[in-house]
């Protein structure tokens, strides 16, 4: 099922991130901002986090990809969203939606519905979030749907990928799902097939999680080791871990 996503392919996408150093503009939640920025840097990408509706499109204009995360959506963030959608549409820029807790509020569901109208949209959520969005996604042809958990499932126009890497400690540090969405966006900036881009990002993140778990004593040191493991991931490690 993942025949097109071997270690060489993943390494090639990661090398393109390291070479191009794409900026990912993150309209994200206040909890996950720091860990998201640090994971992007460890991955070789560059974060920008502007929120103000009157500057967000200027700041994002030269970014390689955009992330919209609904986790602590504010009135200001809500006004920034159409600016980013307009920019992504005009420039054909990749946009990833992280529908945090979309099942908890009609406001989030309405915002998700607007964002899902963007052609080529990529959505990454956990099982509950993706289940809540299922009726909307069923009416969204061309979207890439990513459900993370013990096994990550990527349903893309180019096919289905399943990633069985990672570690349960990844659920004990807040914002790692949010950070994974940003890494998917970074790969979308350098790889036109969003299925392969998401597969590379989540394989790298999962393998870094496995390595970090071997080095850590609990969730605190795990977060630190995860940044280090992601920053030093190389093709030889991918080959060994992907088998
Ligand atoms: N039980 C598990 N075993 C291995 N890896 C896991 C497990 N659960 C989650 N992961 C990994 O953790 C990362 C985050 O996924 P998760 O589904 O926990 O996100 P999330 O619920 O959106 O997190 P958050 O909202 O806290 O940011 C993914 O890379 C995923 O593969
Ligand atoms: C804990 C939390 N609350 C809103 S966003 C967030 C980070 C994980 O999604
Ligand atoms: Mg989440």
Language-model features: locations:
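Conserved N-terminal subdomain of the carbohydrate kinase-like
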Residues: 2-97
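Charged C-terminal helix
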Residues: 5-8, 207-243
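Conserved beta-alpha-beta core of the PfkB/ribokinase-like small-molecule kinase fold
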Residues: 56, 65-137, 147
């Amino acid at each position: 099922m993942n025949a097109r996503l071997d270690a060489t392919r993943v390494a090639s996408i990661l090398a393109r991130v390291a070479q191009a150093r794409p900026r990912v503009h993150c309209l994200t939640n206040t909890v996950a901002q720091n860990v998201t920025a640090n994971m992007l840097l460890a991955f070789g990408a560059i974060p920008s986090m502007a929120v103000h509706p009157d500057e967000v499109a200027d700041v994002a204009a030269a970014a390689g990809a955009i992330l919209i995360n609904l986790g602590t959506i504010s009135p200001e963030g809500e006004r920034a969203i159409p600016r980013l959608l307009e920019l992504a549409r005009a420039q054909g820029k990749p946009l990833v939606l992280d529908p945090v807790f979309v099942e908890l509020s009609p406001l989030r569901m309405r915002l998700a519905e607007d964002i899902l109208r963007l052609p080529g949209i990529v959505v990454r959520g956990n099982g509950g979030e993706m289940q809540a969005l299922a009726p909307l996604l069923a009416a969204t042809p061309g979207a890439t749907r990513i459900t993370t958990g013990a096994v990550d499932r990527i349903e893309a126009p180019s096919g289905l990928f399943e990633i069985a890497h990672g570690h349960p400690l990844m659920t004990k540090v807040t914002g790692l799902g949010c950070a994974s969405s940003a890494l998917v966006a970074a790969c979308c900036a350098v790889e036109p097939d969003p299925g392969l881009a998401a597969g590379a990002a989540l394989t790298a993140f999962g393998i870094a999680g496995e390595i970090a778990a071997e080095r850590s004593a609990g969730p605190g040191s795990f977060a630190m080791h995860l940044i280090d493991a992601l920053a030093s991931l190389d093709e030889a490690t991918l080959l060994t871990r992907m088998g």
